[in-house]
Amino acid sequence: MLKRRIIACLDVRDGRVVKGVNFVNLRDAGSPAEMAGAHAKAGADEIVLLDITATYEGRGTLLETVRKTAAELFIPFTVGGGIRTLDDARAVFDCGADKLAINSAAIADPDLITKIAARFGSQAVVLAIDARRTGSRWEVFKTGGRTGTGLDAEQWAAEGEKRGAGEILLTSMDCDGTQTGFDCELTAAIASRVSIPVIASGGAGTAEHFVDVFQRGHADAALAASIFHFGVHDVNELKRTLSAAGIPVRLEC
């Protein structure tokens, strides 16, 4: 059975890690390189770095931040934010990223998913979806959660897979930063529409929330930020709880 992954997320603005609630009210959490290294040593399976204002500010990814962070890591490293072209993708890979997360650029040009997958492989392409409940469905948002697109999240995830995405990074905007639990209904809905791994994001607060999203949400991985940055949970302790609940995880020897 495939191991479930625990992923630490670094939301970066102006070269610093920040974290807020529902995508607003951001507060400083530290240096990306230092925090990434600490999370890796603490037992995180992967690190995701998201340059959360690159698209909104119309600029590229902070490559020097990516380079310094990659130098601290010995586990898979995903980078997102400001990646609009194959050249952007190549530059981020050259700085040490293992995978790319694309969101707004893929909505503007869905062929970008196919182009990056054809050049670098599907395993290197993560389709990031920021979703918010709108009535009986979930709507996809772009530009760091600032703009609704009208796209249905389930349909967009399925299209992303067809175009070559190797994973879905699914963030519940309703739950983001609240520490009240993942949106298991949303996660399960997306997981049922695709055959590629789904990473659940938004709402982690307790170990039980992780158990819930793996068991009820059928997530392949779960991502968190606040609870790791501010010392609420230790990754290895969390993994021991998951293992005791019958969820397969990679434990430190």
Curated annotation (Swiss-Prot):
GO biological process: L-histidine biosynthetic process
Record-listed E.C. numbers: 4.3.2.10
Domain of life of the organism encoding this protein: Bacteria
Record's catalysed reaction(s): 5-[(5-phospho-1-deoxy-D-ribulos-1-ylimino)methylamino]-1-(5-phospho-beta-D-ribosyl)imidazole-4-carboxamide + L-glutamine = D-erythro-1-(imidazol-4-yl)glycerol 3-phosphate + 5-amino-1-(5-phospho-beta-D-ribosyl)imidazole-4-carboxamide + L-glutamate + H(+)
Main location: cytoplasm
Pathway(s) where this gene product acts: Amino-acid biosynthesis; L-histidine biosynthesis; L-histidine from 5-phospho-alpha-D-ribose 1-diphosphate: step 5/9
Any single Gene Ontology cellular-component annotation: cytoplasm
EC main group: lyase
Subcellular location: Cytoplasm
Name this polypeptide is given: Imidazole glycerol phosphate synthase subunit HisF
Gene: hisF
